[in-house]
Regions:
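Nucleotidyltransferase catalytic core that binds NTPs
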Residues: 1-161
């Protein structure tokens, strides 16, 4: 069974992330969504909340598993018996960083491939950072995130007001 890892902070998960995840299930028997704590980014949601939001959005697909990971991605991927890391590319601006990461991962673990997927056009501009900013300012994000994320953002941002 070929397995891939899709890592990220998912703070919060967006429909762009989900597009990449669901399309990756057509390429791999299992996709492990690996949620990184990423405390240096000062996340809005803690890692347990982010895992719960990803699970809620993906629970109907038995080929998707959600878990937390810390440390080197290549170590985690090898522990999971993954053959590939899936990364989403929204724009050229993503490519340079992702390409450098793919090369470093290949240096650290030559057997681990990196597969780049682009989201559908309607999600090509969507990022977690933009979603949080639009939500903070009262904008409608309902078509850009799962319903559970929209509710969670409203609750979380309502708490901080």
């Amino acid at each position: 069974m070929q397995r891939a890892v899709y890592p990220g902070s998912f703070d919060p998960i967006t429909n762009g992330h989900l597009d990449v995840i669901f399309r990756a299930t057509h390429l791999f028997a299992e996709v492990v969504v690996a949620v990184a704590p990423n405390e240096q980014k000062k996340p809005l949601f803690d890692v347990e909340e982010r895992i719960a939001l990803v699970e809620e959005a993906t629970h109907e697909n038995e080929r998707i598993r959600v878990t937390q990971f810390d440390g080197l991605l290549v170590d985690f991927a090898m522990k999971e018996n993954s053959v590939a890391v899936v990364r989403g590319l929204r724009a050229i601006s993503d490519f340079e960083f992702e390409f450098q990461m793919a090369l470093m991962n290949r240096k650290l673990e030559p057997s681990l491939e990196t597969v780049f997927l682009t989201p559908r056009e309607e999600f090509s501009y969507v990022s977690s950072r933009l979603i949080k900013e639009v939500a903070r300012l009262g904008g409608d994000i309902s078509e850009l995130v799962p319903a559970g994320v929209s509710r969670a953002l409203n609750e979380k941002l309502g708490e901080s007001s």
